């Protein structure tokens, strides 16, 4: 990594995706291998520049992934229901300080600090095996590697993370059941009872 970082620092021009991936590598190494990464960590001004580039090209509402209509309804329903469950402001497609995008964020009203992130697993975050020999019926989907890494990084930075699948959300019958489920999910993620309605 040291040689790659030094080569990239000296390169006059790089592709946008390369810069975004370099920032993702930096964030992951800083979160999980700070002891080894410290020796050849990028300069702070380079990190700031990469973060700005990353936020511009990969995060927030301007770059939100387009969901299918039925999936979009689930995300909206989760966000709307959260407003009746927790004291705070609910944001869809929120961009974190690190530049990473999350499905739903609940922030404190006054300080705007994050209470919790809620991720909704569906076709945009899950994948199924393409192996024709694998059993398809009842075969569990897997979370995409990039989505899983993003969640690990955010948790490592101290953010509370709650995840719900679209299928589970659709199986909840009424509004009360959905609110109770979200309350329990947020409580398990570490949100204090005082913040829950």
Positions of predicted regions on the chain:
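Eukaryotic RNA-binding helical-repeat scaffolds
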Residues: 1-197
């Amino acid at each position: 990594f040291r040689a790659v970082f030094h080569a990239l620092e000296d390169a006059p021009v790089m592709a946008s995706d390369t810069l975004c991936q370099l920032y993702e590598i930096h964030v992951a190494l800083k979160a999980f291998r700070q002891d080894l990464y410290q020796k050849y960590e990028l300069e702070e001004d380079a990190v700031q520049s990469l973060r700005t580039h990353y936020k511009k090209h990969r995060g927030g509402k301007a770059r939100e992934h387009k969901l299918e209509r039925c999936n979009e309804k689930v995300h909206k329903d989760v966000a709307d229901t959260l407003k009746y469950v927790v004291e705070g402001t609910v944001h869809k497609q929120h961009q974190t300080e690190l530049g990473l995008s999350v499905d739903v964020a609940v922030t404190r009203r006054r300080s705007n600090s994050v209470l919790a992130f809620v991720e909704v697993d569906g076709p945009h975050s899950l994948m199924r095996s393409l192996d024709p020999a694998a059993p398809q019926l009842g075969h569990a989907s897997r979370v995409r590697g990039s989505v899983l890494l993003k969640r690990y990084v955010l948790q490592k930075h101290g953010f509370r993370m709650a995840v719900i699948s679209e299928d589970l959300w659709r199986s909840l019958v009424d509004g009360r059941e959905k609110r109770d489920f979200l309350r329990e999910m947020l409580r398990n993620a570490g949100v204090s009872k005082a913040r829950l309605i």
